A protein has these predicted regions:
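Hydrophobic alpha-helical signal peptides and transmembrane signal-/tail-anchor segments
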Residues: 1-17
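Positively charged n-region of N-terminal signal peptides that target proteins for export
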Residues: 19, 31-36
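N-terminal capping/linker segments that flank leucine-rich repeat
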Residues: 36-38, 45-141, 155-160, 180-182, ...
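Conserved hydrophobic position(s) of the canonical leucine-rich repeat
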Residues: 118, 128, 139, 150-151, ...
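Conserved hydrophobic beta-strand positions in leucine-rich repeat
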Residues: 121, 142-144, 163-165, 187-189, ...
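Canonical leucine-rich repeat
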Residues: 131, 152-154, 175-176, 208, ...
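Single conserved hydrophobic/aromatic residue that forms the stacking wall/gate
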Residues: 309-313, 317-321
């Protein structure tokens, strides 16, 4: 829609200026040249506004004047990284990817802005409170773990080709919208809970929205959060799921025919159907509300951990506890 708007404005300017140029055909050439110049300047302005620049925005809980370090891998072969540390001044750094892999500076304003296109980006362990990714189509790996990212403040909508997201141990993060990230293969958003009396520990993520179809997701590690439901129907490639210690009442994994490991310990699940998960090798489902479990179809199952219930015995089960 935005692109169409720009094209419309360009068209209007074009018609207006051509009309003016035509109407002045009997006037002197100097005036006609001014009209042409005016048109070209207007066109350049519109095109300039239409250009979207790659950018990563960060806010932190650090006091102004504090040192801040991040680890980028830029797309540019010269390793150029441009940073605004918060005062509107852009500074250029060179990251060669071998000896100098980090960028270090002093935060002088509320928002740190990094303008270079990235392949990978690491801002972990840095007191980051928000991350916003804008037009980073080459970004495939984002590490922002062990931070203080708040509620919905992880915006990766500008990194649709992201393959690996490590955002674990952000105790204030509550929401992850990954509905457009079909190329994501690995998600680690686990929550290694701190002291329960810690007022900053909100209990972990409550909502994860996955793609409704066509997802390439293979691994999800999301234990010790507060997730009550999650839809895997658009993620047929999932192989490993760890949702231990959440608030799940039920879980549907019937469409996950490639599933190898499922860990749903310490939830509130009363019914579990794994009849279609014939590739399943490891199943951990103790500390739930299960009263019965049918694993007759799970002939590859080798490791089963569950509370004391009635089960139908599989053929290749090597251990049960």
């Amino acid at each position: 829609m935005l692109l169409c708007t720009y094209i419309f404005f360009i068209f209007v300017i074009l018609i207006f200026n051509l009309k003016e140029i035509y109407n002045t055909k009997h006037k002197n050439k100097t005036k006609r040249m001014k009209k042409i110049t005016s048109f070209l300047i207007s066109l350049c302005i519109v095109l300039g506004f239409s250009e979207v620049q790659s950018e990563i925005k960060l806010t932190t809980s650090l006091e102004l004047g504090s040192d801040f370090t991040f680890y980028p891998k830029p797309v540019a072969s010269d390793g150029k990284v441009i940073v605004d540390w918060g005062d509107g001044t852009k500074k250029e750094y060179n990251v060669d990817g071998m000896w100098n892999k980090k960028v270090n500076g002093t935060q002088v304003g509320d928002t740190i802005r990094i303008f270079s296109p990235m392949q990978t980006f690491d801002c972990s362990d840095a007191h980051v409170t928000s991350v916003t990714i804008i037009d980073e189509p080459d970004l495939t790996l984002l590490d922002c773990y062990n931070n203080e990212i708040e509620r919905t403040n992880l915006d990766i909508s500008g990194a649709l080709n992201l393959e690996i997201l490590n955002c674990y141990n952000n105790p204030k993060l509550l929401f992850l919208n990954l509905s457009a990230h079909k190329k994501l293969t690995t998600l680690d958003c686990r929550h290694d809970k701190s002291d329960k009396s810690d007022p900053d520990d909100k209990g972990g993520i409550t909502t994860i929205i996955l793609p409704s179809e066509g997802s390439e997701l293979e691994n999800i590690t999301a234990y010790n959060n507060d997730i009550s439901s999650i839809d895997f129907s658009g993620c047929p490639n999932l192989r490993y799921i760890n949702l231990e210690g959440n608030a799940l009442m039920d879980i549907n994994v019937l469409s996950l025919t490639n599933l190898r490991k499922l860990d749903i310990r310490k939830n509130h699940i009363s019914n579990l159907d794994v009849s279609k998960n014939t590739a399943l090798e490891k199943l951990y489902c103790d500390d739930n509300a299960l009263t019965e479990l049918n694993v007759f179809a799970n002939t590859e199952l080798m490791d089963l951990v569950l509370s004391l219930i009635h089960i139908s015995e599989p053929t290749r089960l090597l251990s049960i506890s």
